[in-house]
Regions:
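Catalytic Walker B motif of ABC-type/P-loop ATPase nucleotide-binding domains
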Residues: 54-57
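Conserved catalytic motifs of ABC-family nucleotide-binding domains
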Residues: 50
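Helix N-cap at the start of a conserved alpha-helix in ABC-type nucleotide-binding domains
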Residues: 65-67
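Conserved ABC ATPase signature
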Residues: 29-33, 37-39
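Conserved catalytic loops of ABC-family nucleotide-binding domains
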Residues: 74-87, 95
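Conserved ABC ATPase "signature" region
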Residues: 6-24
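Hydrophobic anchor residue at the start of the ABC signature
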Residues: 43
Length: 135
């Protein structure tokens, strides 16, 4: 984390932990956190300095469904605020939260479509959009 004094850095860190639902766990050691909580700490670290581009590789893999919804809502909010968010996932219901779906196989692009036009993702889009609106 760069910029500002120690108190400013701590404040930004606390805000990032709050955004991922871990504000109450700030004094816990890594060994006291579950796998999903560690995943959320990693997400908090990634958003801490407000990057223009956020690349998240399977960001919801260790999360329960409720926390997955919260984190995808956070990513949607970051995107609405002007950040580019790139999600790597094997889950069609997670991909449905995205604007575009790029399918790869052995490093080659098979398709690049709006989520609504991707046959495997499109059935999940209405529910994903409804969850995003609620988040």
């Amino acid at each position: 984390m760069t910029g500002g004094g120690a108190s400013a850095r701590r404040k930004r860190a606390l805000e990032a932990l709050e955004q991922v639902g871990l504000g109450g766990r700030v004094d816990h050691r890594p060994s006291q956190l579950s796998g999903g909580q560690k995943q959320r700490v990693a997400i908090a670290r990634a958003i801490l300095n407000n990057p223009r581009i956020l690349m998240a590789d399977e960001p919801t893999g260790n999360l329960d469904s409720a926390t997955t919804t919260e984190i995808l809502g956070l990513f949607s909010a970051l995107h609405r605020a002007g950040q580019t968010v790139i999600l790597v996932t094997h889950e069609n219901d997670v991909a449905a939260h995205c604007q575009r779906v790029v399918r790869l196989f052995d490093g080659r692009i098979l398709s690049d479509l709006p989520a609504e036009q991707d046959d495997e993702v499109a059935p999940h889009v209405p529910a994903a959009r409804a969850m995003g609106a609620a988040a």
